[in-house]
Regions:
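Active-site nucleophile/metal-coordination loop of metallo-enzymes that catalyze phosphate/sulfate
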Residues: 1-5, 13-183, 193, 197, ...
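Short glycine-rich anion-binding loops that position phosphate/pyrophosphate groups of nucleotides
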Residues: 13, 253-254
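Long, well-ordered, tryptophan-enriched scaffold segments
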Residues: 104, 154-241, 245, 254-256, ...
């Protein structure tokens, strides 16, 4: 006799002994407790090479869904990017080389935009640093980094660690031009008022300002803001101007798509009024469409 089988995927439900920051162990879940007590529980590996991620990298919902749906291990795009960087191939990409040539001719700035985080869900630190190094190796003299802080896939006040790591590895000529929480620039729910606040800091160099990244973090924490919700601040430079180039560094598309569309599309439905800078190039680690 055949019986129906229901596969229910509960994002965020996992097994970890430590109770700190662990909603699962602290929650009241009588049904799951009964299943566990009756021995109706087994475990799947959901991180690292078991799901096509780098060894030791935690998994996430998108990765889990992809592997479950495929019924096999699927190498993630982050792994492909990592290999490209390790093999020294990133600086050989034609689009990046063309952008470098144009910037050398007009004295423009390359703007790198990415989530500065060790979470590994939307970006990787080695990708951010590798991109800056590849640009510097091509002779790009002005590299402005627009840092988006996490606090969603990482601890809520851990940005200092990742910002310090980024700053210590940036090549000569690179600097952090703006800083703000992912809540704004990485919105994916058509809440354009959030994106507009990030736009003001990143593109127009307007709104809240700070002297350096650490001062902004300290001020945000004193105001009760956590990393995800840090008010976008302009730090250095004149924003994104005509003749500049932009390179988005997140490898996951869903939370880059809106900001990228605002920067490249005139008739994006629902988007706020703005003047788009005339860029010589707008690049991405992946296709964000």
């Amino acid at each position: 006799m055949t019986r129906p089988l229901l596969l229910v995927i509960l994002d965020g439900l996992g097994e970890r002994e430590a109770a700190d920051d662990n909603a699962v162990t602290q929650a009241y879940m009588p049904t799951f407790d009964r299943l566990r007590n009756e021995g109706l529980v087994s475990f799947l590996k959901t991180s690292g090479d078991a799901v096509g991620l780098p060894d030791g990298q935690m998994g996430n919902s998108e990765v889990g869904h992809l592997n479950l749906g495929a019924g096999r291990v699927v190498d993630q795009v982050s792994v492909q990017i990592t290999k490209t960087i390790q093999q020294g191939e990133l600086s050989k990409h034609k689009l990046l080389r063309d952008a470098a040539s144009s910037l050398a001719g007009n004295g423009g700035t390359l703007h790198l935009i990415g989530l500065v985080s060790g979470g590994g869900v939307h970006s990787r630190m080695d990708h951010l640093i590798g991109a800056a190094e590849a640009a510097a190796n091509l002779g790009i003299e002005r590299i402005a980094f627009h840092a988006l802080t996490d606090g969603r896939d990482t601890a809520p006040k851990s940005a200092t660690l990742w910002i310090q790591q980024l700053e210590s590895c940036l090549p000569k000529g690179a600097y952090i031009a703006s800083l703000g929480g992912r809540f704004f620039a990485m919105d994916r729910d058509q809440r354009w008022e959030r994106v507009e606040k990030a736009w003001a800091a990143i593109v127009e160099a307007k709104g809240a300002s700070g002297t350096n990244a650490q001062d902004v973090l300290d001020h945000a924490y004193n105001q009760g803001e956590t990393d995800e919700f840090i008010t976008p601040h302009h730090l250095e430079g004149a924003g994104i101007r005509d003749g500049d180039a932009v390179w988005f560094l997140n490898f996951r598309a869903d939370r880059v798509r809106q900001f990228a569309a605002a920067l490249t599309q005139d008739n994006e439905p629902g988007c706020f009024d703005r003047r788009r800078p005339n860029l010589i190039a707008c690049l991405g680690m992946v296709d964000y469409r």
